[in-house]
Amino acid sequence: MHKRTYLNACLVLALAAGASQASAAPGASEMAGDVAVLQASPASTGHARFANPNAATSAAGIHFAAPPARRVARAAPLAPKPGTPLQVGVGLKTATPEIDLATLEWIDTPDGRHTARFPISAAGAASLRAAIRLETRSGSLPDDVLLHFAGAGKEIFEASGKDLSLNRPYWSPVIEGDTLTVELVLPANLQPGDLRLSVPQVSYFADSLYKAGYRDGFGASGSCEVDAVCATQSGTRAYDNATAAVAKMVFTSSADGGSYICTGTLLNNGNSPKRQLFWSAAHCIEDQATAATLQTIWFYNTTQCYGDASTINQSVTVLTGGANILHRDAKRDTLLLELKRTPPAGVFYQGWSATPIANGSLGHDIHHPRGDAKKYSQGNVSAVGVTYDGHTALTRVDWPSAVVEGGSSGSGLLTVAGDGSYQLRGGLYGGPSYCGAPTSQRNDYFSDFSGVYSQISRYFAP
């Protein structure tokens, strides 16, 4: 994972800003896309620093045994049921979750803060994240308490006391490797004996989420899938903007520690500063506890058509911090989140239309099938307002070639506006399609953005 240079970021911003300014003024039921102006904080994108860079990691920590291989295989079926997220991690619990802070090696920084490091490991894990409970004996945790997280990669993520809740565990970012190193930083007026720390469970990934520079899932999708960069529209400003609005989602269930993948889209809005509105599927995020664990992966695509893993975009960026649920309708499978952290520079706020989609429309989908690098599918809307698998007000899309798969859930159904820009019209629920499917099964179903817009319109304007 590499940081964009200042000049490259400015170039992206300038080009996209020009596209935004050329867009028609949005009406009451639609809005053109726009470029991101604010930049993500280093702490939320893996560019934090240890408070005590040269400190050793304490021997005291928590170790989890590897899960049975059969359990790992059973958790990640090749063809998950429609309307279910793709599982990529399994939960492991321990009967002894407490860590005695007095046993850690504490070192003070020059400004008087107290620091210590400890490991959380799981045998054989390719990637790992941990549920952490940290609280003072009086209850509330000061905002200036810091936690730093690192794995085998170069990334160091940061959380503060205000990110941790007394009501539920805080799930760390996903790190590479089988050992998560945690640095705990306490303000000068807080002593280790004032705190209680426990790690009740971890989420265990058998395959690396970040292997060799974000090659996770690379090539794992079906043979009929098309790299986003291979689309005939690739290289046009409108299409490239649309791809920059799409992110891979990784989230964890606090109930069992299982981790899952979906796809989501950043949506434009008229607020100043912009709100980080993020569209996906209700079946991906079931409750606020799960939304709080969300991390999004941006710019995960190849830079060459049908390129190998070496062509993965070097600007891939992970954003941590979770999200809040603004709207969720399980029956319609609609979901609107608000990311708690600002996405990285270079992302795009996708335009949208709340006008009902017309039967016969040409639909486009940019998604992450099986967690693979970004793919593109194009199809025809063959039915609107239909019921499928117990869900209502869905839009059916027929695929002539490339389809969608597990991990694509929540990805946006896009249409092209009169000015050539893309507009979001719904999100993927699922269906019977797969590479090699007969014509009768080469179709999938999307939620309808227009059907719930009256419920969510207040979030898109001041």
Swiss-Prot record:
One of its GO terms (biological process) is proteolysis. Residues 1-24 form the signal peptide. The keyword GTP-binding does not apply. Keywords: Autocatalytic cleavage, Disulfide bond, Hydrolase, Phosphoprotein, Protease, Secreted, Serine protease, Signal, Virulence, Zymogen. It catalyses: Preferential cleavage: Lys-|-Xaa, including Lys-|-Pro. The keyword Hydrolase applies. It is found in: Secreted. Lysine-specific endoprotease. Involved in corneal virulence. This is Lysyl endopeptidase. The lineage of its organism: Bacteria, Pseudomonadati, Pseudomonadota, Gammaproteobacteria, Pseudomonadales. The gene is prpL.
